[in-house]
């Protein structure tokens, strides 16, 4: 309002003296402006040089951070958890107390390394720090709950799982992960409750329908699963054909299932889940060469949680095809990875005699 009042004030007549005074000021300012421009140009060069040096320092810091992080990951893969902890901490030290997505992800790695190294309390402290930073961090609650579940502290596990579900929003993968954790702990009823929360998340995108169909499939509600998955497919969700194949498989419609698995693999050859499922189906049908091919492809991709199933089926496929040398070699590796599988140990003794 003040600006407007000044702007609209009635102009007064300008005297000749005022005109001359302004001209003198303009002439003086013109001389000064040349000197000022020289100073500005000089300061611009200094500033640009400073920014360039700062940029180089930032690049070096980021490179160091990335290098330490990769060293930590490599150490974990080699079983050197103490080395991994040090590397991840060095990566975090590069951040100078600045917290972003990369730092949070590095903290997850650090906590996993701490737990693997037998430093349970340190891992708990790291997860708790993540929670203190973001009270709605569903992932941190889930991982802390998973730690307590592994330690058979089910009260604390459930407490953190409930908080993870509370803040999961429309993260269907979180609800499914919670179900899987409960299933592993023999708490199927609690796990199903988490799945139901996932259904309640709502949403009408192709991904929403696909994930709800997947959840109904886990709940054994095949009619609703098919309805949701069909809608997702109509909305052009390519991932859904994998879940529909699994639905056909549990319903005993093997031909339909195999067709969808193959169709999915043709477009997504980097998905180990489909490869493991199709490999298992080919094994059951006696198509051993085909089964071996799919299972080896899955293992080459790192089958993750399905690695044990893939490797076990690969051994059976080799054995059934008469390739006992390959079966024995694969079994040697399997028994190292899964020493508590007593059935496999007995099978290994059998293969030793072939």
Residues covered by each model-derived region:
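Structural marker of alpha-solenoid helical repeat scaffolds
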Residues: 94, 98, 133, 167-168, ...
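Register position in tetratricopeptide repeats
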Residues: 77-78, 116, 150-151, 184-185, ...
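Canonical tetratricopeptide repeat
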Residues: 70, 105, 109, 116, ...
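N-terminal leader/linker segments that initiate helical-solenoid repeat arrays
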Residues: 27, 38-42, 47, 52-112, ...
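Start-of-helix register in tetratricopeptide repeats
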Residues: 66, 100-101, 105, 139, ...
């Amino acid at each position: 309002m003040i600006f407007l009042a000044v702007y609209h004030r009635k102009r007064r007549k300008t005297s000749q003296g005022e005109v001359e005074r302004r001209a003198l000021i303009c002439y003086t300012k013109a001389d000064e402006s040349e000197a000022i421009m020289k100073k500005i140009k000089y300061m611009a060069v200094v500033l640009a040089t400073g920014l360039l040096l700062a940029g180089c320092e930032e690049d070096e810091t980021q490179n160091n951070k990335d290098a330490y992080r990769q060293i930590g990951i490599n150490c974990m893969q080699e079983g050197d958890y103490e080395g991994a902890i040090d590397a991840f901490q060095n990566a975090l030290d590069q951040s100078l107390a600045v917290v972003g997505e990369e730092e949070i992800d590095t903290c997850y790695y650090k906590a996993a390394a701490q737990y693997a190294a037998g430093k349970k309390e340190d891992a708990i402290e790291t997860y708790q720090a993540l929670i203190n930073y973001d009270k709605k961090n569903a992932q941190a609650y889930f991982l802390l709950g998973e730690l307590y579940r592994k330690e058979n502290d089910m009260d604390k596990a459930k407490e953190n799982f409930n908080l993870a579900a509370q803040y999961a929003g429309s993260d269907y993968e979180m609800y499914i992960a919670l179900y899987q954790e409960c299933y592993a702990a023999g708490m199927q009823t609690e796990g199903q409750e988490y799945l139901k929360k996932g259904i309640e998340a709502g949403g009408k995108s192709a991904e929403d329908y696909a994930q709800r169909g997947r959840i109904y499939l886990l709940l054994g509600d095949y009619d609703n699963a098919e309805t949701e998955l069909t809608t997702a497919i109509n909305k052009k969700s390519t991932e859904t054909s994998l879940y529909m194949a699994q639905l056909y498989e549990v319903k005993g419609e093997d031909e339909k299932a195999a067709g969808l698995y193959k169709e999915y693999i043709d477009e997504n050859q980097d998905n180990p889940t489909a490869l493991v499922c199709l490999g298992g189906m080919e094994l059951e049908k006696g198509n051993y060469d085909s089964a071996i091919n799919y299972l080896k492809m899955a293992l080459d991709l790192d089958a993750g949680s399905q690695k044990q199933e893939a490797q076990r089926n690969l051994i059976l496929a080799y054995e059934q095809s008469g390739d006992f040398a390959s079966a024995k070699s694969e079994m040697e590796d399997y028994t190292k990875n899964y020493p508590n599988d007593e059935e496999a140990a007995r099978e290994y003794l059998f293969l030793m005699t072939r």
